[in-house]
Amino acid sequence: MVSWIRKNLLLVLTVSSVVLGALCGFLLRGLQLSPQNIMYISFPGELLMHMLKMMILPLIMSSLISGLAQLDARQSGKLGSLAVTYYMFTTAVAVVTGIFLVLVIHPGDPTIKKEIGTGTEGKTVSTVDTLLDLLRNMFPENVVQATFQQVQTKYIKVRPKVVKNNDSATLAALNNGSLDYVKASVEYTSGMNVLGVIVFCIAIGISLSQLGQEAHVMVQFFVIMDKVIMKLVMTVMWYSPFGILCLIMGKILEIHDLADTARMLAMYMVTVLSGLAIHSLISLPLIFFVTTKKNPYVFMRGLFQAWITGLGTASSSDTLPITYICLEENLGVDRRVTRFVLPVGATINMDGTALYEAVAAIFIAQINGVHLSFGQVVTVSLTATLASIGAASVPSAGLVTMLLVLTAVGLPVKDVSLIVAVDWLLDRIRTSINVLGDAMGAGIVYHYSKADLDAHDRLAATTRSHSIAMNDEKRQLAVYNSLPTDDEKHTH
């Protein structure tokens, strides 16, 4: 037992930090701490988030470029197609699971809205504009700018200009705002454009792969940079248990009227948590077993550290460094697979978010007494899938993209604010499911590409041996040619 604890000390500390953080948070709620004191308690957790975020950009760049540069174009294409197929399928399964549960359990009761009160006015969101933003962010006009800003369509209320010949009725309408209209404006907002950076790095990695030996020095630079970043990550990991403890404790202390909110939204929480449990403990393991014929729960055991970190940070991108270590060191997945599949998965594969958005949208319809037709349910499933892909892998992004799903079926956007009170908990749990889905996807992709990768390694080793042998022959020939002949000896 002692030897097991010593071997898995970091995992034990991380799990203990989650339990202690929750326990201390609930115990300290009775002290009615001020927002300033709560901020002080959360500060070590804030530092952890800063450390992890600091690693994301260099890690994504070095891992993607070094991983793809060591593959040929055919292998890159195969890895990409396998990963995207897996992502689309598991997201669809998650959405269907969520919709089935919310329709069967029916957690939404119109009396809930009366108890909680009406929501605050929300923002307008267009499905088309969201799609266009996704495409704009995929191809940033400035790569440096993409490291700290992304494109987002915002809606501005515009008032028509008053002209001299306006009649009194028109002037009155202009003054009271009834002639105002909403105009879409494409703006830059703060936050790294992860999707754009990934697309750029994929292009660079594939180009380096095609250049072959010419690009050897540049490839080695990114390989070494990747190792340096992972060394820094290992140092941060030993600080993470304390940071996670403070994050969870601070978040529990921030929540007002925790008991009342939990009572009123209990069935909604049960529905979401049941869906996430079914997806993570049944659907994903079943997909893994059918595709690899291996025990999925043994594989999942090796991912426990990443799962717990996702629970603490509520961000799949921030958990990325730990997921790399779990897959490569605990489970022996080839780094060329993890370095390509995981950054893409952390950006577009959001199974937990898709399930949550489908459940939340239908729950809001139920508390408003709105019966959704089959066509509207299909619309919810499609837009939830799209919204989960468009959601940045940052805390509470799912709450923002919920607006897209509600707008698509004509539900009141302002009612999103009714479920904000419990989102801090659901966000952490669905993020941990997102991390699990990404990692299991990497395991499945590795299973199908292992033979090709091994063949590529054997070919590379043979080519290297042949090259060394040729160089030795040339060296021996040069030495032989430099020796004097018998005639030259006689002359001397």
Swiss-Prot record:
Record has rRNA processing as a keyword: no
Single GO term (MF): glutamate:sodium symporter activity
Keywords: Glycoprotein, Membrane, Symport, Transmembrane, Transmembrane helix, Transport
Coiled coil: none
Bilayer topology annotation: Multi-pass membrane protein
Superkingdom in the source lineage: Eukaryota
Location(s), subcellular: Membrane
Main location per the UniProt record: membrane
Record topology, Extracellular segments: 106-191
Glycosylated sites: N166, N176
Transmembrane spans: 8-28, 47-67, 85-105, 192-212, 228-248, 270-290, 358-378, 389-409
GO cellular component: plasma membrane
InterPro entries reported for this sequence: DAACS, Na-dicarboxylate_symporter, Na-dicarboxylate_symporter_CS, Na:dicarbo_symporter_sf
Residues exposed to the Cytoplasmic side: 1-7
Functional summary from the UniProt entry: Transports L-glutamate and also L- and D-aspartate. Essential for terminating the postsynaptic action of glutamate by rapidly removing released glutamate from the synaptic cleft. Acts as a symport by cotransporting sodium.
Family of the protein in this entry: Belongs to the dicarboxylate/amino acid:cation symporter (DAACS) (TC 2.A.23) family.
Protein name from the UniProt record: Excitatory amino acid transporter
Species of the source: Onchocerca volvulus
